[in-house]
Amino acid sequence: HNRVLELNQTADGWDVVTEKGTISCEHVVNAAGLWAKQVGRMAGIELPVSPLSHHYLLTDSIPEVAALDTELPLTVDLEGFTYMRQHQQGMLLGIYEINHQHWMMDGAPWDYGIELLNEDIDRIENELTLGFERYPVLQTAGVRNWVNGAFTFSPDGNPLVGPVPGKRNYWSACAV
């Protein structure tokens, strides 16, 4: 990995200027995560994404989960604004925050090292309550760890995936 410094459209594709040199390519895919907005601007595109604070919790080991021979699938509760998946021998409950908090509207600073953000459990209390009601195993499982980190979202919560209109051979894979 190395940082993209410029994107220059050419007659037959793109020149991607990085910290380690220039790469000429036919197609560019913006999959820059927390830096997607800045990388889009390098191509003259204003992507409707920004990093938000995103909470999830990890449970202690759950005997029923530990006893399984296969990994449980991801479960999403769109009405409850939560998702849950297996994490080692416990579970991970993630929150799609109704009262979301923007972290950096213009994207993460280039030197951001993926440090965690301060927890704000009060802000996600309603979603947590719904999650604990929908997934009863959480009511008896201990919480091993709370995590609040930055994650890039679009305004409607959907991913921006596919070709970008008006930019030949420029693709987006953002907010996924």
Model regions and ranges:
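Core beta-strand elements of the Rossmann-like FAD/NAD(P) dinucleotide-binding domain
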Residues: 17-27, 31
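Short, hydrophobic/aromatic-rich segments at coil-to-beta transitions
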Residues: 12-16, 73, 169
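Central beta-strand plus flanking loop segment that forms part of the substrate or channel wall
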Residues: 43-70, 126-129
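C-terminal catalytic lobe of FAD-dependent flavoproteins
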Residues: 79, 88, 111-176
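A conserved short coil-to-beta-strand element within the FAD-binding core of flavoproteins
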Residues: 1-14
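Extended catalytic-interface subdomain
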Residues: 73-108, 124-125
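Short loop/edge segments at beta-strand edges and connector loops
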Residues: 1-2, 18, 145
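Flavin (primarily FAD) binding-site architecture
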Residues: 30-45
